Every structure is written in C-alpha cells, then in structure tokens.
C-alpha cells in the first residue's frame, strides 16, 4: 500500500507541475495526501509518524499561497538580491528590447507551442498589382542588366538601368500610395528584391537598401507632415536617392559608442538666425552614399543650454540632410569585396542644420535608437533573408542542371555520391530557407515586428548562403572559379562577405543578440521580473516581481515535468495540429521545444547577467532556437504548398538534419556549462 501511495503521490505532483497549478492547490493536495497516508498506512516508522511529517509541506504551501505572507518571507529577500546583482541596462539596450514584437518565437520559448500561432500566418501570396509588377517591370529590368558589364567594366549599373529603376518606383516600394509610392507588401518587396538580385547582386542591393532601414521608412513612420510632403514622393519617384549613415570607423554600428554629435544652438540658415543643431560626424561603409542626394544621419544630440527642454544629454537623434548642403563631405568610394553596388564614407565638420531637418521634429529628439530598432525589426526580416535565400535557390538551379550535363567517366557527375552529397545540401537549404523567408515576410505583413526572428534569420540565411555557394563551386570546379561573362555563380560568391557583415555582423548577431534578446523578449516571465526589479517604486516593484516570480516558478516546474515526460516517451504524446504525414514531425518539434524551454530557462537563471560574456554558450542556444524556427517554417511551407507528396522526402530530410543539429548543440551546451 505504501508503495502504491508513493507512486500515486508522485504522479499527482507531476500532474500539478505539468499543468502549472497554483500553489494553494499544491498545498491542498499535499494535505490530502498526508491524510490518506495516515489513514491507510498509519503513523509508521518515526515517533511523529511519516503521515504527520507530510502535513508540514502542505501547511507551508497553503500559508505561502497568501500573497502578503509569500512576499514577506520568500519574494522580498529574492527581490532584494536580484536588484543588487542585476546588471544595469543601458538606454540603448532598453530601447532595443522594447522595440519589435514577439510571436512564434515566444511559442518556442514557452515549450508548449500553440500551433495555430504558426499555421494561421497567411500563405505567401501577391496581389494582382504586385504580380503584374513582378511579371512586368521586374522582368524587364532583369533583361536590361548585364551583370558582367556591371561588375567588371563599369563597377556600377548603366545609367539607363538606374533611370528605369527610378522611373518605375523600385526605390519606393515601401512608400505608401498616398505619398506616391507603390505601397507593396513585405512579401512583394522580398520577392522583387530576390528576383532582381538573382540577376545582379549589385542591382538587388541598390533596390533593397532604399526599401529597408533608411529615410523612406523613417519618414513614413515618424516624419512630420511637412517632411512627408516634401520628400516622400520625390523618394518614391527616384528624384531623391537616399542613404542612411549609422556606422562609423571607431564604434562600428554600436550606437552606444558612437562619437558623432550634434549640439543645439542658434545659427544662420537661408539668411535667418534659427534654432538648430551644429553637427560633427564621420561615417563609413554607407550603401548608396556616393550617389545619394538625401542623407539620413544618426548622432548623439546635446543641449548644454537646455533650449529644447529635454535636458542636456538628449540622446540619439536622426537627421535628414541634403548631400549638397554646405559642409557635407562625400568621401572616396569603397569597394566591398569588389562588388559593384555604391558604398562609401561621408563626414561633416560644424555643419549647421535647422531643427525641422530632424526626422519627426523636436518631438523625436533623443528617440533615434528606438526608431531605428523598430524599423530594423521589420526591415531585417525582409532584405538579407531575400538575398541569402535567392542565392541558394539560384545555386540549386544552375548546379543541379550542371550536375546532369557534366559527364565524368562517361556518367553525369550528379549520380556520383561525392557530388550528390553537397547537391542534396543545396536542395534542402533552398526548400527550408524559402519557407522561412516567406513565413517571416508574412509576419511583417500582418503587422508584426519580429526583432528576434529577423536577427536569427539574417544570420542563418547568410551563413547558409556562404556554405551553399561553396558547395556549388565545389561541384562546378574550374567552370565556376574562372570569372567571366558566362560565370553565373561568381557574383553571388563574391558578395558573401558583404551579406555576412551588414545589418549586424553574424558573429555579433549569433552570440550576443539572438538568444540573449530572445530570452528577455520572448520568455513568458523574465522580462516582467527584470522590469519589476528596475522599478524605482520598491513597493510596486515587489508586488509585480512576486506575481512574475510565482509564474516563473510554475513555468520552470512545468518545463522539468514536460521535458522529462516527452523525452522518456520520445514525443509520442506531444501535440500535433495534424493527423497527416507530418504528425510525428510536429510532435518531435514540440518535444525539442520543451527541452529548449527548460535548458534556456536554466541558462538564464544560472548565468544571469553573465550571459553577455558566455557568448559561446549563448551562440549555441541561438543555434537551437533558429533550428526550431527553421524546422517549423519548413513544416508550414509543405502545408502551404498544398502538401505535395514529392516534396515530403525533402521535408523529412530537413527535419532529420535539424534534430541532429539541435542534439549536437545541446551536447555542447551541457559539456561546457559553467
């Protein structure tokens, strides 16, 4: 009987953990178990009896379920300790955390994904107008481009190509129709950039940049009515060519270390003395900089006389400056990896601009980093994933054809296992990353700003671009190594280092941003706990912390129980939204998401602020998160494509690869855990 009760008790408490039951219920169950034990087993083996001892935890749990008592005895000491050890979050870090939204990434962090959050994301589709643009102007400009002439002879696109792009509003796809732009969806922008880039990377980047983070998007979201009226239609029609200057020679794109500054003062503008900003800056690696007519500029704004009423250290601010303005210096052009797209430095010394040249006016002074992060959350989800994905797809198209017609030892090289292996990697990545690109663009179209997903997708697509271009060159051999007008691979291969580096270098994105930021933004309770600990009102902070901490404790117990159960049963009882061929793959995804939630929780709890320094560990957790995301979007793509039976072996191979990669990453985390 005693053994039976022990097993029943463990099962009951396991169920309580699995369903995140409140503490008072735990206490009542413990008291009930103690009473049953005493009735059926008796006082037992000790002077007080085991049954009597079992009442103690039950009573304690019931008492601690009263919020006031729990805060006094348990939460308050923990709250005080957390406040002391919690690293101070800088203003730029806080704004980066506050920017963007969470969606499917939060489901993966929860360990119990709600499948409707994934499957309800609409299928990738273009409107009739967008499809007509793809079939018309996008097709025509591809026919106009001679990539060899562009990158080898001119190191620029011909003037007639530039003119066509401008006149057909390729540079104004994200600008709304109300302001003269095309107002295309994120899906359309991604597909158009992909199409142009597969013909010429230089042309693709030249189209991508004005439709990503820059003056157009910033003015659409934050510009004053006068600024929108003045610039948006001109930007949409190509009468103004924009660039955005953030990166500098000293701090890179780290805004916290930026040395570029502006001081609020009075100065002369158009013959009148007006209140404005005197700027000094030095920027590098600015795409479209050499040909831009309108310069977006990030700088630290200071107001020593508090003329704006915002204090002396106003913060990061964004300005909009015509490049022909007095004092603006456009430096000698860069040649990133010998690519043909325009890129170069710019600088200015004691350049005076009026206050109405600040994007959004004085209302947005000091809010520049938040503005940039909000735009980057969506822009980064569209641009580089499009370039990376289409490069892999193009590599697949030409390499699969080449492997069929190139013969060695009287047989096509494609039938050789040594060639089939890298070719299969290209096949799998082309399918997988097209699915992730399409789903992520659809998220943006639904109004999400997926900051964590955009970061992980940027680094994974561009790393995959590097790997699969290497595979393609290996299969082609000398055919791809010798550059010339008929070499259809070398342009993309040449651009790989650029894609790896821009919009957040992959080393930084993988090891510092993806998991660390994801844990704070997508974890169900962590962000609430940190916000409570930073609350200047200690009473309110303690109350909020108590609520979040109680939820976090239940969440952790559920993860322990759920992970143990699903791993022992190999995911046989995990959830799945379908009974079809993908059922087992959804169940395994649930199983590994549960394990990720458990391990991720312990990593954050144990390391705390040290997670910034344990970058190898953080990078491996980022790999697991990104593998889970790519796995889920692959399953969704198969459903969205109409469940094509011939694609199922590819899907299953992708899933097996993701499982192997996740298990390897887990093993490395465990082997190197501090």
What residues fall within each predicted segment?
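Flexible, small-/acidic-enriched active-site or ligand-binding loops
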Residues: 326-352
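Amphipathic, small/basic residue-rich leader segments at the start of a protein or domain
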Residues: 9-14, 27-29, 33, 37, ...
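Loop-to-helix element that buttresses phosphate recognition and phosphoryl-transfer chemistry
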Residues: 418-445, 470-473, 628-637
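A short core secondary-structure module
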Residues: 272-328
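A glycine-rich, basic-preceded beta-loop-alpha segment at the flavin cofactor/substrate interface
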Residues: 345-380, 397-414, 559-581, 592-612
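Glycine-rich phosphate/cofactor-binding loops in nucleotide/flavin-utilizing enzymes
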Residues: 368, 480-582, 674
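C-terminal amphipathic alpha-helical interaction region
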Residues: 550-674
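Charged, glycine-rich active-site and insertion segments that engage polyanionic ligands
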Residues: 448-480, 649-659
